[in-house]
């Protein structure tokens, strides 16, 4: 049972990426779905945040201050 489910899931993923090679917009959407680096919460005002290029982690906006980034209301 588990083996057939795993095979079925792998087939869907492979088909999706094969289809995405033809359609660049679908590839972008698949990459966003596959990424699992976004938290289930947002970082509050005044707290440090990672580089905004790595994802939108702030409740408001992540702005640079020197070499670090902070969540600010802008």
From Swiss-Prot:
Main location: secreted
Entry GO terms, CC: extracellular region
Cell compartment(s), UniProt: Secreted
Disulfide cysteine pairs (residue numbers): 42-59, 49-62, 58-71
Positions of the pro-segment in this chain: 21-39
Range of residues in the leader sequence: 1-20
Domain of life: Eukaryota
Keywords: Disulfide bond, Knottin, Secreted, Signal
UniProt KW Cytoplasm keyword: no
Keyword Disulfide bond attached: yes
Distribution of this protein across tissues and organs: Expressed by the venom gland.
UniProt domain comment: The presence of a 'disulfide through disulfide knot' structurally defines this protein as a knottin.
Name listed for the protein in its UniProt record: U2-sicaritoxin-Sdo1a
Organism: Hexophthalma dolichocephala (Afrotropical spider)
């Amino acid at each position: 049972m588990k083996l057939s489910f795993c095979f079925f899931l792998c087939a869907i993923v492979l088909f999706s990426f094969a289809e995405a090679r033809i359609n660049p917009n679908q590839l972008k959407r698949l990459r966003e779905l596959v990424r699992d680096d976004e938290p289930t919460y947002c970082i509050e005002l005044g707290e440090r945040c990672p580089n905004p290029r790595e994802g939108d982690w702030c409740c408001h906006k992540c702005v640079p201050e020197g070499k670090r980034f902070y969540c600010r209301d802008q």
